[in-house]
Design a protein with these regions (language model features):
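FAD-binding core/adjacent interface of flavoenzyme oxidoreductases
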Residues: 1-9, 65-153, 228-230, 239-243, ...
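Glycine-rich Rossmann-fold phosphate-binding loop(s) that bind the pyrophosphate
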Residues: 12-16, 38, 133-134, 155-160
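FAD-site-proximal beta/loop scaffold in flavoenzymes
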Residues: 127-148, 223, 233-313
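C-terminal catalytic lobe of FAD-dependent flavoproteins
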Residues: 7, 225, 233-265, 344-421
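Rossmann-like NAD(P)H-binding beta-loop-alpha module
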Residues: 140-189, 193
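Mid-to-C-terminal Rossmann-like scaffold of FAD/NAD(P)H-dependent oxidoreductases
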Residues: 4-6, 289-392
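Beta1-alpha1 glycine-rich phosphate/pyrophosphate-binding loop at the start
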Residues: 2-76, 165-188
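A Rossmann-like FAD-binding core segment of flavoenzymes
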Residues: 30-32, 78-98, 104, 171-273
């Protein structure tokens, strides 16, 4: 008789994967848990990479989410520095890229492999060209910024690019922020609030080249010396940070065995409201595109809080699928999404969904344009709210505005009451 315990594999050893593994144990799973990550590190926190690590305020080890004793207490089959190559959903067999291409037979898999940063053609191996996704990425750019007086070109005006530009400028470097939008973080914040944030960067000494596409990196002797813009001009730089978005890390789910009946991998791993992509296969974190039944739309959210919350939800629902008598019924994953960004002395906090809004209402607190609340909506409903420079009490109160869908006129009236209270 076989003595093997049933195994659940969690593929991805960052915040979502850790939350899933911890959730499985906390909820009572006594079978094996394989936690597989392609980086050599124990699970660590990514948001500090573009802030405290890049600035030098933290040493790398401070990003660890758990220490070795806490990880050991989970009783995991921990496989770090190991890449998943393929998953066969019919056989429930996971293939790993270590020596011999190990196959793991699983009763369930939680996919939490996150995203991979985009690059530009012809930049592989060019000294001074950076992306910012891993601890090694952050430490490499940090070492470059330890030399005073460098010129940094940041390509991409989203959250990552804006945060990195703020850190580099605070360190005293010459920073140029280049993007195709007209403002900073425009896709998320909209033109009005994005314009205010762009003014903050300019006031801090950042040069903005907005409405500009980058066609390539100019290199001499294998080293970056600038970026070339679509208008033919060049931004001279000693270092170039590419913050031009990312792609869901779903390649291993396309591997042998997935076949034509495999999961939908368009813009991530498509999941239902329970985070399930197929029987026994669940998604969590940046990789997961799931249906939010309260908001009645599909979402894929690349934010830290969502990663942890969805990791736990995926664990709970996988267990409920495997043994409903023991673990109960599955529950829809219906969070109120949250993210924050620190730039200079500003803290931006957002609840709900801001992207894709067709209307935005901005209310300032007093005469300071950088103490504000902004309401975001679509299809006649309020969907998200942003706070900049507001006290915690007011920020917490704003979340209630969009926790459930509210008609736009009612939400606008409540926004005024919340800000003026």
């Amino acid at each position: 008789m076989s003595t093997h315990r049933p195994r659940i594999a969690v593929v991805g050893a960052a915040a979502a994967g850790l939350a899933a593994a911890e959730g499985l144990r906390r909820l009572g799973w006594d079978g094996e848990i394989a936690l597989i990550g392609d980086e050599p590190h124990l699970p660590y926190d990514r948001p500090p990479l573009s802030k405290q690590i890049l600035s030098g305020a933290w040493e790398p080890e401070r990003t660890a989410l758990r220490d070795t004793e806490q990880i050991a207490a989970l009783g995991l089959d921990l496989r770090l520095g190991t890449r998943a190559l393929a998953y066969d959903p019919a056989r429930r067999v996971l293939t790993l890229g270590d020596d011999g291409h190990t196959e793991l037979r699983c009763v369930g898999v939680i996919a939490a492999t996150g995203v991979t940063p985009r690059s530009l053609p012809g930049t592989d191996g060019v000294e001074g060209v950076h992306v910012l996704r891993t601890l090694e990425d952050a430490c490499a750019l940090r070492r470059r910024l330890a030399t005073p007086g460098r010129r940094l070109a940041v390509v991409g005006t989203g959250v990552l690019g804006a945060e990195a530009a703020a850190v580099a400028r605070a360190l005293g470097h010459e920073v140029t922020l280049v993007g195709t939008g007209d403002t900073v973080m425009e896709r998320v914040l909209g033109a009005e609030v994005g314009g205010l944030l762009a003014d903050v960067h300019r006031a801090q000494g950042v040069t903005l080249r907005t409405g500009q596409a980058v066609t390539g990196v100019r290199a001499e002797a294998g080293r970056a010396v600038g970026v070339v813009l679509a208008d033919g001009s060049t931004v001279e730089a000693d270092d170039v940070l590419l913050a031009i978005g990312s792609d869901p890390a779903v390649g291993w789910l396309r591997g042998p065995g997935a076949g034509t009946a495999g999961p939908d991998l368009t813009d991530g791993l498509r999941c239902d409201e329970f985070c399930a992509a197929a029987p026994g296969l669940y998604g969590a974190g940046d990789i997961a595109r799931w249906y939010h039944p309260v908001l009645r739309r599909e979402l894929r959210i690349e934010h830290r809080m969502n990663a942890s919350e969805q990791g736990l939800a995926a664990a709970r629902n996988l267990l409920a699928e495997l043994d409903p008598e023991r673990f109960g019924e599955r529950r829809p994953f219906t969070p109120v999404p949250y993210f924050w960004s620190d730039q200079y002395d500003l803290k931006l906090q957002a609840h709900g969904v801001l992207t894709g809004a067709d209307r935005i209402e901005v209310r300032t607190l007093g005469k300071d344009p950088l103490r504000l609340a902004a309401l975001y909506g679509g299809d006649g409903l309020a969907t998200g709210v942003l706070a900049i420079g507001l006290p915690p009490r007011r920020t917490r109160g704003l979340r209630a505005l969009i926790a459930t869908p509210v008609p736009w006129p009612e939400a606008v009236a409540r926004l005024a009451d919340a800000v003026d209270a």
